[in-house]
From Swiss-Prot:
Primary location recorded for the protein, binned into one broad class: plastid
Protein name: Chlorophyll a-b binding protein 1, chloroplastic
Record's subunit section: The LHC complex consists of chlorophyll a-b binding proteins.
Similarity remark: Belongs to the light-harvesting chlorophyll a/b-binding (LHC) protein family.
GO MF annotations, alphabetized: chlorophyll binding; metal ion binding
Known role: The light-harvesting complex (LHC) functions as a light receptor, it captures and delivers excitation energy to photosystems with which it is closely associated.
Membrane topology: Multi-pass membrane protein
InterPro entries associated with the record: Chloro_AB-bd_pln (IPR001344), Chloroa_b-bind (IPR022796)
Pfam families: Chloroa_b-bind
Secretion signal span: none
Cellular component per GO, a single term: chloroplast thylakoid membrane
Annotated positions binding chlorophyll b 5: 161, 258
Domain of life: Eukaryota
């Protein structure tokens, strides 16, 4: 068995299915799904040692393990969360996935309220109140139209979400009948029907744009949560109130409501 082993370069063959010759009657198949990203264009301002830093020219020297190899690396890690390579890889995946969910969630929080304020009838357009409509006598009608999806069972909705989301996540990680997945973070193939990742340089820049917008969306969702708790209103209604009376409708004014004695 020792004579049959071979040295495999993870950088040269990352993401490539590898078959190693038979050992007796068995066969070993290995598929490395997470490897180093393709090197971006040398002139890109987002990668490499001369990339944009979190404080621009005042950033100082970044940690040695933040080399500008991955998208969204601004050389800032004061807590040392990326020092361990395995933890870094896990956190990268968590950030990308949470960014995508946050972008979808932020759109889902704002868009129904926007439609409602422009004449589209909803049972409840405010994002943190909409789900409770399923417990009402008439149930929950998507877009206020009973001919689309008329939901009356929270268990049925939960089951549908588990099946649909589980199937997509399973394919993203392990592949499926539509093709193999080389990188579970950027599976491509059926997940990229427009071929946006065909050009490596454009793809490298899109990764950065995705993370920048995703980080903004995560902060936005946090703001929506706080607004819902403090004001009991949706994001657009809060925005309209602030524009109408910025002196009395702002974060500082609401924060003083929680000061002892008020």
């Amino acid at each position: 068995m020792a004579a049959s082993t071979m040295a495999i370069s993870s950088t040269a063959m990352a993401g490539t299915p590898i078959k190693v010759g038979s050992f007796g009657e068995g066969r070993i198949t290995m598929r490395k799904t997470v490897g180093k990203p393709k090197v971006a264009a040398s002139g890109s301002p987002w990668y490499g040692p001369d990339r944009v830093k979190y404080l621009g020219p005042f950033s100082g020297e970044p940690p040695s393990y933040l080399t500008g190899e991955f998208p969204g690396d601004y050389g800032w890690d004061t807590a040392g969360l990326s020092a361990d390579p395995e933890t870094f890889a896990k956190n990268r995946e968590l950030e990308v996935i949470h960014s995508r969910w946050a972008m979808l969630g932020a759109l889902g929080c704002v868009f129904p309220e926007l439609l409602s304020r422009n004449g589209v009838k909803f049972g409840e357009a405010v994002w943190f109140k909409a789900g409770s409509q399923i417990f009402s006598e008439g149930g929950l009608d998507y877009l206020g139209n009973p001919s689309l999806i008329h939901a009356q069972s929270i268990l049925a909705i939960w089951a549908c979400q588990v099946v649909l989301m589980g199937a997509v996540e399973g394919y993203r990680i392990a592949g499926g009948p539509l093709g193999e997945v080389v990188d579970p973070l950027y599976p491509g193939g059926s997940f990229d029907p427009l071929g946006l990742a065909d050009d490596p340089e454009a793809f490298a820049e899109l990764k950065v744009k995705e993370l920048k917008n995703g980080r903004l969306a995560m902060f936005s969702m946090f703001g929506f949560f706080v607004q819902a708790i403090v004001t009991g209103k949706g994001p657009l209604e809060n925005l309209a109130d602030h524009i109408a009376d910025p002196v009395n409708n702002n974060a500082w004014a609401y924060a003083t409501n929680f000061v002892p004695g008020n």
